[in-house]
Amino acid sequence: MAVLSEDVLLYLKEKNIPMLFEQIVQNIISDAPERPMSYIGDLMRRGIPLQIFIAGPAGSGKRTQCKNIADRLGVVLISSGQVLTRGVESGSETSQLAHSYVSRGERVPDTLVSMIMKDRLSQSDACEKGWLVEGYPRNAQQAQAVEECGVIPQVFILLDLPEDLSFRRLEHRRYDPATNKXYHMLDNPPPGGRCRVMRTAPAEGCKFP
């Protein structure tokens, strides 16, 4: 095998060639096309959709950053909490199994959560436009489970936030059900300084991990 020169290695790095080949191989493994060469040609013509995970602690600004990035890149924004809730309500075999855990007040296993997420990421809009998943995976077990399902993002962004700052942001959150608006008593107070409901955690579903 030929030894690559420094110039060649630099070129490969600048043009993201290793990532390109990795994505081609991942798509082939996922779709198992009958004619791989024709499949690769078609994939290159239509482009490889972006696949992004953004995770972080509560109060780290995931929702705001995800919306900004999704709008800029034109990818489908997928909230993990909404996917899990709607997945349970969809009536599929997987969702019915998840519902059996929820109805007993038990934690839905990570492998089952990853299957529900994979189903959503396999839908036509996400496949065509690419996707950005907000708030998933939430732990190492979920990361391993979703990888075993064949979902490997091109980019994983972790929003780091000190625990005391996370608590400060959550402590002062308020939600007004009359206007369906969220406020922060220090940074973005409601008109008149009053708001009926205090929200101390994101609405992501306590029954899911």
Swiss-Prot record:
Residues 172-205 are annotated as: LID. Its EC number is 2.7.4.3. GO terms for molecular function: adenylate kinase activity; ATP binding. One of its GO terms (cellular component) is cytoplasm. The keyword rRNA-binding does not apply. Monomer. AMP binds at S80, E106, R107, V108, G135, Y136, P137, R138, Q142. It catalyses: AMP + ATP = 2 ADP. It is found in: Cytoplasm. Residues 79-108 are annotated as: NMP. It comes from Trypanosoma brucei rhodesiense. Catalyzes the reversible transfer of the terminal phosphate group between ATP and AMP. Plays an important role in cellular energy homeostasis and in adenine nucleotide metabolism. Keywords: ATP-binding, Cytoplasm, Kinase, Nucleotide-binding, Transferase. Belongs to the adenylate kinase family. Its main location: cytoplasm. This is Adenylate kinase. Pfam families: ADK (PF00406). ATP binds at G59, S60, G61, K62, R63, T64, R173.
